[in-house]
């Protein structure tokens, strides 16, 4: 009989956040290894308290459910602590062999771990981040940091196994429980990754896709481009000019004088990919702190899958996938002047291994883990 894996987390299927892309790729690996996978994600358009079994749909061949995203204190408390919806799905499914919890809230995680142990179900975690609430309001910061600390330092070490997105997390948890390293993966057979564009050779076309917030340092790229000697265009996907200036008001003069930086606001995933395909390089820069070391950039894997090399700095274990003249350029320094110098010497095209992050490359290692 085919074993059943229940995969639960804050992913918005089929493609509304990075978590959804990761979970679907991982689920395909499990399916290739003879497992049936059931998904329970979130739906921000769903009314809170909607019966979970009535949300059932089929996504890429996977039985999928959703719970509503909370709004207000009472709903948040329920969301962070209750496991009733998950037990409802478990009780209405074939015998569950394993549960995988994706970046899960700690109280609910603890309850599900107890349930799984009592019912002889393997309980794993898929760990893709080490969140920081730095810069948030005091009460939120205390609650969030406490939740993160308990999950990362205590609960994960007691799981039956961990799927981790970075070498940093693999090294951190080694010796506590078995770990499986899976970076951000894609399905190379999907038509959306086909790239028939010819790279521009009259000017360098860059793209940044994301929401910088406190994570991506888009300001470093803007400052660097303001100093370059080459002709360029930068397409910024994910935020508007007004939103960018709310983060970096001192850049108003730079952007007023530079018409080669174009802000497109938020676009669909497929529209964003089209911009990435057309670019000579996709770009992002991050602080090399624990948050960046623990994660693995979805935009990096997706750009490579599009056939577009990446200009970035060395965070996480990105350097494992970039070699001289292939897949991109890793800038050693976070200094905008050094980034400018690198940009001035960039070739219009570079060899890219489009299949580097295809999920099929990891079928064997997942089989050993399971």
Label each PLM-derived region with a short phrase.
Residues 41, 149-194, 200, 209:
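Donor nucleotide-sugar binding/catalytic pocket of nucleotide-sugar-dependent glycosyltransferases
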Residues 17-18, 216, 268-275, 282-301, ...:
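Nucleotide-sugar-dependent
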Residues 1-52, 60, 161, 223-229:
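N-terminal subdomain of nucleotide-sugar transferases
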Residues 238, 248-274:
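Nucleotide-activated donor-binding/catalytic signature segment of Leloir-type glycosyltransferases, i.e.
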């Amino acid at each position: 009989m085919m074993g059943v894996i229940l995969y639960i987390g804050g992913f918005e299927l089929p493609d509304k956040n990075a978590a959804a892309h990761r979970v679907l790729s991982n689920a395909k690996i499990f399916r290739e290894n003879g497992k049936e996978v059931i998904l329970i994600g979130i739906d921000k358009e769903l009314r809170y308290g909607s019966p979970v079994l009535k949300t059932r749909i089929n996504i890429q061949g996977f039985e999928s459910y959703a719970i509503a995203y909370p709004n207000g204190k009472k709903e948040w408390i329920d969301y962070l602590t209750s496991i009733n919806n998950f037990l409802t799905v478990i009780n209405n499914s074939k015998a569950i062999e394993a549960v995988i919890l994706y970046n899960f809230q700690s109280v609910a995680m603890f309850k599900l771990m107890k349930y799984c142990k009592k019912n002889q179900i393997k309980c794993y975690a898929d760990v893709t981040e080490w969140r920081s609430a730095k810069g948030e309001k005091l009460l939120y910061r205390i609650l969030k940091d406490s939740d993160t600390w308990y999950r990362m330092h205590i609960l994960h070490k007691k799981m039956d196994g961990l799927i981790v997105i970075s070498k940093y997390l693999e090294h951190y948890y080694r010796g506590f429980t078995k770990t499986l390293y899976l970076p951000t993966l894609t399905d190379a057979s999907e038509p959306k990754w086909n790239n028939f564009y010819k790279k521009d050779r009259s000017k360098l076309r860059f793209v940044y896709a994301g929401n910088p917030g406190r994570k991506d340092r888009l300001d470093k790229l803007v400052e660097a481009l303001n100093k370059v000697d080459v002709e360029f265009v930068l397409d910024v996907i994910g935020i508007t000019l007004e939103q960018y200036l709310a983060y970096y008001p001192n850049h108003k003069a730079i952007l007023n004088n530079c018409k080669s930086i174009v802000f497109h606001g938020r676009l669909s995933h497929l529209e964003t990919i089209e911009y990435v395909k057309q670019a000579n390089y996709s770009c992002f820069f991050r602080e090399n702190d624990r948050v960046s070391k623990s994660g693995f950039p979805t935009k990096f894997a997706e750009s490579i899958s599009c056939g577009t090399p990446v200009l970035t700095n060395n965070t996480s274990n990105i350097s494992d996938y970039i070699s001289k003249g292939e897949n991109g350029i890793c800038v050693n320094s976070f200094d905008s002047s050094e980034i400018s110098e690198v940009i001035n010497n960039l070739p219009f095209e570079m060899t890219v291994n489009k299949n580097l992050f295809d999920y099929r490359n990891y079928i064997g290692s997942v089989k050993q883990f399971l």
